A protein has these predicted regions:
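Residues that mark the junctions of alpha-helical repeat units in TPR/alpha-solenoid scaffolds
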Residues: 28, 64, 100-102
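Terminal, low-structured helical/coil segments at or just beyond the last alpha-helical repeat
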Residues: 85-137
Length: 137
């Protein structure tokens, strides 16, 4: 309840420690899922992944598919595209059309971003090799 109050007041830095304690004591995974969402909002991506995975493992979450979407987004931010797509595909199996549509959009976005990142890396490598050849010439 206290964490919800802080969260609603946009006092996320105060909500997180309260939720961390509540998640440890809770018999349900939902508190970890909420904590993972807040971590993601705060760009604490690795913490987000750990919290959401802990919540899913613990079970008793409101929407497993919604948690998988957020977990996919966290992996996407880390450029773990394969794991992100895996989570999005799992979420896309949900009966809720809204979640399914969102998950499928994320899959396409992750696929495109993965190609873009690989192409940038190839381009960067090519430029570095070209500069090295010029220096050695």
């Amino acid at each position: 309840l206290l964490a919800d109050s802080w969260r609603m007041a946009q006092e996320i830095d105060k909500a997180i420690p309260v939720l961390e304690q509540a998640a440890k004591m809770s018999k349900e995974g939902e508190t970890y899922i909420l904590l993972g969402n807040l971590y993601l909002f705060e760009d604490r991506i690795e913490d987000s992944i750990r919290a959401i995975e802990a919540g899913l493992k613990k079970g008793k979450v409101k929407s497993e598919s919604q948690a998988q979407l957020v977990l996919g987004q966290a992996h996407f931010e880390m450029e773990n595209f394969e794991e992100a797509k895996k989570q999005f595909r799992a979420a896309a199996r949900d009966k809720d059309k809204r979640i399914k549509k969102t998950a499928n959009s994320w899959i396409k976005y992750a696929e495109n971003e993965e190609v873009r990142v690989k192409n940038l890396a190839l381009r960067r490598d090519f430029i570095q090799q070209s500069k090295a050849k010029e220096t050695n010439s």
